[in-house]
Amino acid sequence: AGTMTGFVSNPIEYAEASKVAIFGVGMYTWNIENYDPTQAWKDACDFIMPEASMAFRIFCEHNCDPGPNGHQYRREESANYVAPIQTFLAGYKKNTFPEQSANLLGTLFAQITASPSMIYSQSPNKRLIEQINPWLIQFEFLGKAGTSALHMAHAWYEKDRSYTWQRYLETSALLDSMKLINRTLNQKAQPKGVKVGSKVLHPFIVDLYRQTGRNLLSTDGIAPDEVKVSIPSIFTNIDQLKSQPCAEGDNTVGYVPLFEVVKVQPNQYLGIGWEIQKEAESFCFNLPKSNQPGRVFEWSADGKSWSLIPHVSTENAKDTIRTIDPKARYIRMRNNSDQQMELYVLGFTATTKQDPQINEALMMYDMNLDTYKNLNPGEMIHIKCDDINAVSFFLSGSNENLVSITGLSQDGEKNIVYQGNVGYIKLNKTMFEDFSSLEITTIGKESIHIHQIVRE
């Protein structure tokens, strides 16, 4: 150590982007006893991008974590906002709107939205901008999604379901854009994709979005926490896997690989589930050391009653199963022995059919606001009015399109119950009590989307 005068680094293709980390190492080796990591980080940001140092600091502060990975290696990120987020989510789930936390987060998301354009316009370091460009693009979407999600939550707090639904659709579109960027940019590197705010901020937006979806689908008889949303998911009663993230694609759902031994006690399991309107095409597993007696694979239509998947040899640690019951919506591997199993989870994925024959009734009643049934011009959907006190429609489409809801009586008489813009529409019983069914159709040249029909 007494002869050390410097250090060597090899940032490979990200030389400029690596300078923040290299600067910190340099400050540490220069004066180990008085090293201040926070100050070194601030100095690095100021030195590398003096023209837009605050914007660059904001970008770096919320881009530390590599995202979910098989090594379970995560970095601290957005540390100053963990407590406000926890406070806000806890309050929101109790139908309150913690304003202090909301204002703090609203300011942050506004800064995040503005930071990329400031970096683009003010920094002359074109090589650095080129290296971080995919993350700058994604970062702006993160800020917009966070802002939209907070507006969505406030609308729900104000008991404005119509505006909540508008903001829900906006937040959904922004999150979809982030998914698209993650799947299309930076695909040649390892790890692939573009993840920003992956430790704290992005999970917060998704949590807020999903909680609001449950709120919207709730009724007087079904509380938000009782709403069972049909989305791709993983489930397990193995402690080691409970925090393992879900790897979700357009037509796939599975576990992010875990490169450590997983201990599976008797009757413990790991499983996956997918949307109610989709049918599985295949199931692949890669579970080294699992090929031993007592390992069973099972499927279920409802997540409660399970049936054995036949003809899966216990001699194979990995395999692809293509004969899956069309009713299956869940698959799990369970330790059916009286001994502990030790295995690796390198692959556990279901692939759904890309062009399934979708039952439109499932699309409109699947308890998933992200899916929808296309209602084309001239097409009609009928809803029976028996034994319901209210019916809600979650619709989306062009602002130029109108929707018409007509009541049909037993003797064939028709009367318009609603005619107007698409969006959230709720009809109380007094509006249709004289009718046996309702008929919904679009007025215009374009189709509309029926995301959900909720009968109360």
Describe the predicted segments one by one.
Residues 333-339, 439-446:
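Short beta-strand-plus-loop segments that form exposed binding edges in beta-rich domains
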Residues 307-309:
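A structural motif specific to WD40 beta-propellers
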Residues 1-232, 428-429, 433-439:
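Substrate-binding groove of N-acetylhexosamine-processing glycoside hydrolases
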Residues 328-332:
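Proteolytic cleavage junctions
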Residues 12, 288, 336, 396, ...:
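Flexible loop residues that form catalytic
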Residues 204, 208-295, 299, 311-320, ...:
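Disordered, acidic Ser/Thr/Pro-rich linker "stalks" and the adjacent N-terminal cap
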